[in-house]
């Protein structure tokens, strides 16, 4: 177990958005949580990453965490390189070699010295993902990670996810769509705050 949620509950006013959510993310796995808008997916992810305290229940994390939120949080005045240098210090990294490798995989290395203000939404999301991964976390939490991606970049994303899994890392993908199910090792469905029995997709390992 790399990440575990145990009986998580949360409410906004009288509206209960998480109702005793319990599940585990095993090592070296691609895990998906799908559900309609308003099902509680983003709230769940915010609790798992420590951004939001649950009203009830606990989480357990074994190792480093990477988090790629749905809303890209970048500074328009900074270049891509400046963002990487900032997080190099924040993560305590000796160098940026893995970050540069991620940029090559995601095909945006040519934008290294461009300011974020001139980047497209898809390229911003690539930078967001690179920042979440550049310290090689044991578990990566992704909230609708491929929004704004074209088809080629979408495929590159899944290639990267498989590479991360091959390194023994775990990836948890939150999405409102289930058409990526065949790419996942486990799939959970969140419906009105209730997490339904997971499905193990053995043939989905790619």
Residue spans of the language-model regions?
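Q-loop/switch helix immediately C-terminal to the Walker
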Residues: 71, 76-90
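Helix-to-loop junction immediately C-terminal to a conserved catalytic motif
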Residues: 49
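The feature captures the beta-strand-to-loop junction immediately N-terminal to the Walker
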Residues: 34-36
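Conserved ABC ATPase "signature" region
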Residues: 85, 96-111
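Conserved ABC ATPase signature
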Residues: 115-122
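Catalytic Walker B motif of ABC-type/P-loop ATPase nucleotide-binding domains
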Residues: 140-144
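Conserved structural motif at the start of ABC-family nucleotide-binding domains
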Residues: 3-5, 18-20
